[in-house]
């Protein structure tokens, strides 16, 4: 994730802090120390209030931390626990504020596990704790393997397909994919050389009236079965 810090300001305040702490006046030093305690945490306002509140609750522990001694990784470790987040940028604003820009990940598919609907984010994480209002999301059935899904997604996208062009993805026990396209067209991909089959699939869809086709079987090398 991204971090953004004004280095010139850091150096200035570090020098200032060092000089002031060298003055042997405990009350004064205490005032200076408090001056650099975190008093404000600001989150970007492009996410819903419920999520903002949950993140604020977890970040409350950093109030009154000395801003110089707070490691950005400490904040990032908390944000990483929110699977709905796709990206964030933590910025220290001296002397006493944190500003965090947040953005949610795109949802690309969903599946069911023990009757619970689980979403898959573009960030590769499983998302369950938030209400999702995405439309036209494809479902995943059979074996659930996010790594294989993203590998297939990359190959489809390379040849002009998006995941939501399809209704359903089914990963067989053999790790071979079946795809449901336009509600009624079943595409059987081979176990190997998937990308070549996707090229063939693209050509078939472009050059044929697929309304009368129910199955495109590409499992056998150098053979296309339409039925």
Regions found by a protein language model. Give the residues of each.
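Charged, solvent-exposed interaction patches on well-folded alpha/beta domains
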Residues: 1-227
């Amino acid at each position: 994730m991204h971090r953004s810090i004004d280095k010139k300001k850091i150096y200035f305040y570090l020098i200032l802090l060092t000089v002031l702490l060298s003055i042997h006046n405990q009350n004064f030093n205490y005032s200076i120390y408090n001056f650099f305690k975190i008093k404000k945490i600001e989150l970007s306002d492009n996410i819903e209030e419920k999520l903002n509140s949950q993140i604020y609750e977890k970040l409350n522990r950093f109030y009154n931390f000395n801003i110089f001694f707070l490691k950005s990784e400490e904040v990032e470790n908390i944000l990483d626990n929110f699977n709905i987040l796709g990206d964030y940028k933590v910025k220290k604003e001296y002397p006493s504020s944190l500003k965090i820009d947040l953005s949610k990940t795109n949802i690309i598919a969903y599946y069911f596990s023990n009757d619970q609907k689980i979403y898959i984010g573009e960030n590769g994480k499983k998302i369950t704790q938030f209400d999702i209002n995405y439309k036209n999301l494809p479902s995943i059935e059979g074996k659930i393997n996010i790594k294989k899904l993203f590998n297939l997604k990359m190959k489809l996208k390379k040849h002009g397909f998006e995941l939501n062009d399809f209704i359903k993805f089914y990963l067989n026990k053999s790790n071979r994919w079946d795809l449901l396209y336009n509600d009624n067209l079943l595409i059987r991909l081979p176990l190997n050389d998937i990308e070549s089959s996707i090229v063939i699939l693209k050509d078939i869809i472009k050059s044929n009236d697929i309304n009368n086709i129910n199955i495109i079987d590409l499992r056998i090398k150098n053979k296309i079965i339409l039925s």
